Each structure stands twice: as C-alpha cells, then as structure tokens.
Amino acid sequence: MRSLNDRGVRVELDAVIATDDMHSASNVYVKNQRKTCEALGIAYRLHQMSGSAGYDEIAGRVLLLSNDPDVTAIMVHLPLPEAVDSYKVQSLIAPAKDVEGVNPANIGNIVYGRKSLAPCTALAVMRLIESTGVDLKGKRALVVGASNIVGKPIAVMLMRPEATVLSTNKHTAGLPALAREADVLIAAAGVPKLVTAEWVKPGAVVIDVGIHRVEVDDGEGGTKRVTVGDVDAESVGPVAGFLSPVPGGVGPATVAMLLENTVAAAERAMP
C-alpha cells in the first residue's frame, strides 16, 4: 500500500449491494469491509441498491463500473434479489477488476492453477488451514457445501497440496459418519449450527464458513439477534484441534483476502 501511495496510485474498492435488510449477513460483511479499508487507507465506495432492484438496474451499475477506467476493483454482494440471476451479474464484472474472484473466467483458472483473482472466501479458508501448520498431503479433507464461489473452489484448492478431498452437501447420506473421518472439516452448507460434536474427529481442524443472524432467547422473556455459523461452536470447540470462530474467523480473513486482491488489481492496472 505504501509503495502505491508513494506513486500516487489511488486504491479503491467499489462494492454493490442490493438489500433493504440492514441486519443481513451481507451488511455485517460491509461493516467489516469499510472498517478494514479505512484502517489500511483504501477508499471504499458502497453502491447501495434496493432489495427490489431488477436485473437491468443491477447489471447496468456493474457494467458502468467495469467500463470505468478509474475503477480497478469491483465486488457484488450476494444474495441478490430473488429474480436476479447472480451468475449473469458476476459474468459482467471485468475479470481484471473481479476482486472476489467470482467471474466464471477467474473460477475456471483455479482448476488449471493459473494466476488470477481467486475467490476470497476460498483463499481465506486455505490461509486459516495453513495457519494451523497442518500438512495437508495425504490428509482427509471434507467440505460440506458445494456452492460455485465457496465449496467448489475450496475443494479444488485443497487438491493442490494433495489432500484427499470429499465434496458433500447437507443431503449427503451418512454425512456425520463421513465427517468424523476427516482430518480437516470445512462447513459451508449455509445451515446454522449444522455441525455438532458428533461430526468431528478429535483434534481435527474445523473451519466454519457460515454466518447467520438468528433470534435467540435473551433471558428476559424476549429475543435478540446473534451471529452464528454452520458449526455448533459450544459442542465442537472442546473436540476440535482448531475451530475458526464466528464471528471473527473466516469473515475477517475473507475481507483480508479481498483487500489483498484489491491492491493486486490496482497494481496490475498501472500503466
């Protein structure tokens, strides 16, 4: 960042969001992004759109940013409104500006091991696993969830260091028993507290990708909203060798990877 600033290069992240729910998981992510950007001297510009925005409106904004030579980094928060095809919108992001790595061209490059802007959440998961010091070669790694920008890229990335990878979903038969055999367990199913202690091999590395805002009893006869993951942290924590927290785990690491990609995109855009 300092070298870019010294050369007069402005690093900015343009983020598009379409929701009216100020308590959504996407807005939690937005707050983390803005805070981290400000701390690092990266300009953050949020393009807030209505939760009822249609494809033409959202696509038009993304195309405008993609074609703007002064814009070097673009991301689109999911989910988009139900009627909007996220694949089509993500395909409109210029690959060189796609700092979340969600354009189909960037995702495809993962399979071939080509250098590109890779999906941030998948990168964050890999960095967290690396931080534990575990040698993935020959280890059993199980991924719960097979979304196009999280589960599938993570599975492919785990294959590079020669882990034995099993890609599953919440409907996989005998899933708890399969999970208990895994040395590394990644929960990315989008189901609050799906993974319990019975799923976890003692000492396993468990990465919780999920983030949900749920209502719980506040102890005073009412309810309150709290943030939880796909893992039941209370039961899994004592069993796992490592459990990434929610909040405070994959979320901040994903923001860090996003900003790493943002700086890389700004550098590549330099004449």
Predicted regions and their residues:
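Anion-binding alpha/beta catalytic cores of soluble intermediary-metabolism enzymes, centered on
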Residues: 3-5, 9, 72-136
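Short glycine-rich anion-binding loops that position phosphate/pyrophosphate groups of nucleotides
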Residues: 77-83, 191-193, 211-214, 249
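Short beta-strand segments
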Residues: 17, 75-79, 144, 208
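Short beta-strand elements in bilobed, periplasmic/extracellular small-molecule ligand-binding domains
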Residues: 13, 37-51, 165-167
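Charged, compositionally biased N-terminal leader segments and the immediate start
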Residues: 1-20
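Short, well-structured alpha-helical segments in soluble
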Residues: 57-69
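Rossmann-fold NAD(P)-binding glycine/threonine-rich loop
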Residues: 86-107, 207-270
